[in-house]
Amino acid sequence: MHDAVTRPTPPADATAWPRRITQAVKIGGVTVGGGHPVVVQSMTNTDTADIAGSVKQVADLWRAGSEMVRLTVNNAESAAAIPRIVDKLRMMGIDVPLIGDFHYNGHQLLAAEPACAEALAKYRINPGNVGFGKKKDLQFGQLIECAIKYDKPVRIGANWGSLDQSLAAQLMDENAQRETPWDAGRVLREALIRSALDSAERAVELGLPRERIILSAKVSGVQELIAVYRDMASRCDFALHLGLTEAGIGSKGIVASAAALSVLLQQGIGDTIRISLTPEPGQSRTHEVIVAQELLQTTGQRAFTPMVTACPGCGRTTSEFFQELAGVVQNHVRAKMPEWKITNPGAENMTLAVMGCVVNGPGESRHANIGISLPGTGEAPSAPVFIDGEKSVILRGENIAQEFIGLIDQYVERTYARRAG
C-alpha cells in the first residue's frame, strides 16, 4: 500500500503550481528533488567501451549544460571503461555525475567490476528486465545491495516497452474480476506505476534509504505520460525523472516532449528531465540538452541563457535582416554564457528583443531589457534601441548588428558585474 500525497492547490495568478515535495537525492555534486531546481540530464549514444569517443561526447554534453550524463553499461568492456572515462573527464576539469544504464545483466557487471560500481554516481535499474521468474527478486536484490555497499542512488525506471509482463498479467486478471472493468490502457498504466512503486518499496525493505531513490515510468504518448505521472506523483514522495521514452525526430520530438513535460512541470511534478530526441543526420547530440534548457526556461522553471524574442515576420518585413540579427544575437549570448556565468552572474535572466517593424517592435522592445525595432517595408531606415523600457539610441547604417551586440555586452557588464566581497 502506498501513501497518498496531497496535490498542491493551483495558484490564482500567472505562475506555476508549487513544486511537489519530494525526497532530496544527492547524485555526485547534484541534488535532485527536495525543492531543488529541476535538473537537466542527457545520454550518450557512443559505444561506452570507446573511451575516447565517450569522453568527448560526455564533455560536449556537459559543456552544453547537461548536469548529469547517462551511459550504457551492457557488457564487461563498457563496465571496465567507466572508471577510465571518469578519470579522463576529471583530468579535463569535468566532474559531471555519470549514470550507469543497466538492463538484464547489471547485477553481474557491477559485481565483476567493483571499480565501475564505485565510479558511477547513480545506477539506473529497469524492473521490467532486471530478471525473470524466480530470478527477478534475487537479481534486483543484488543490484540494490550493490547500491547500498557503495552508497549510490538508483533510478528505478519502468518502461512501456519493457513492462514487467507477470505484473501486467496479474493486473489484467484482477481487472477481469471488477464489476466495471477498466479499459486495457488504464490497466497497463497501473502496471507501469505499480512496477516502479513496488520495486521502490522493495528496495527500501532491503535497506536502501528513500532519499537514494528516483522513479520514472516512461511511455511514448503525451496524454499517457501525463496520466501516469499525475497518478504516480499522488501516490509517493520519491523524486521523479520525466521524459518520453522515445520522443522522436526533429520538430515532432520537440513538440511531444514540450507538450507532455510542460503540463507536468507547471503542476509541480518532476525533479529531473531528459529530452529523448532522435538526432537528425549531422545534428549534435547536444541538441537535446539545449531543448531541455529552453523548455525549463520558457516555462519559468530555471534560467540558463538570455532569451531572445523575435517576431515571425510578415508582409511588412520583406527584409531578412531582422531574422539574421536574431540568430546572431542568440548565438552570441549562448557563446558568452560560460564566461558571463562566472563574471556576470544573473545575465542568464536578461531578456532581449529583435523585432522587424513598427507594429509590435517598439512595444516588445520596451518589455525587454534590451530591444531593437528594425525598419519594415516602407519605414524609415533607422532602428531605435530600447534599454529597460526607455529609448536609448537610434542605429543606422551597415554596422547595426555589431553596434547592437556591443550594447548588449555593455549592458551585461554594467548591470550584472560581480560585486567584490
UniProtKB/Swiss-Prot annotation:
GO biological process: isopentenyl diphosphate biosynthetic process, methylerythritol 4-phosphate pathway; terpenoid biosynthetic process
InterPro entries assigned: Dihydropteroate_synth-like_sf, IspG_bac, IspG_bac-typ, NO2/SO3_Rdtase_4Fe4S_sf
Residues the record lists as binding [4Fe-4S] cluster: C311, C314, C357, E364
Keyword annotations from UniProtKB, A to Z: 4Fe-4S, Iron, Iron-sulfur, Isoprene biosynthesis, Metal-binding, Oxidoreductase
Catalyzed chemical reaction(s): (2E)-4-hydroxy-3-methylbut-2-enyl diphosphate + oxidized [flavodoxin] + H2O + 2 H(+) = 2-C-methyl-D-erythritol 2,4-cyclic diphosphate + reduced [flavodoxin]
Pathway given in the UniProt record: Isoprenoid biosynthesis; isopentenyl diphosphate biosynthesis via DXP pathway; isopentenyl diphosphate from 1-deoxy-D-xylulose 5-phosphate: step 5/6
Annotated EC: 1.17.7.3
GO molecular function: 4 iron, 4 sulfur cluster binding; 4-hydroxy-3-methylbut-2-en-1-yl diphosphate synthase activity (ferredoxin); 4-hydroxy-3-methylbut-2-enyl-diphosphate synthase activity (flavodoxin); iron ion binding
Keyword 4Fe-4S: yes
Cofactor(s) needed: [4Fe-4S] cluster
Presence of the UniProt keyword Metal-binding in the record: yes
Co-factor binding details: Binds 1 [4Fe-4S] cluster.
Family: Belongs to the IspG family.
NCBIfam families xrefs: ispG_gcpE (TIGR00612), PRK00366.1 (NF001540)
HAMAP family, sorted: IspG (MF_00159)
Function according to Swiss-Prot or TrEMBL: Converts 2C-methyl-D-erythritol 2,4-cyclodiphosphate (ME-2,4cPP) into 1-hydroxy-2-methyl-2-(E)-butenyl 4-diphosphate.
Annotated protein name in UniProt: 4-hydroxy-3-methylbut-2-en-1-yl diphosphate synthase (flavodoxin)
Originating organism: Xanthomonas oryzae pv. oryzae (strain KACC10331 / KXO85)
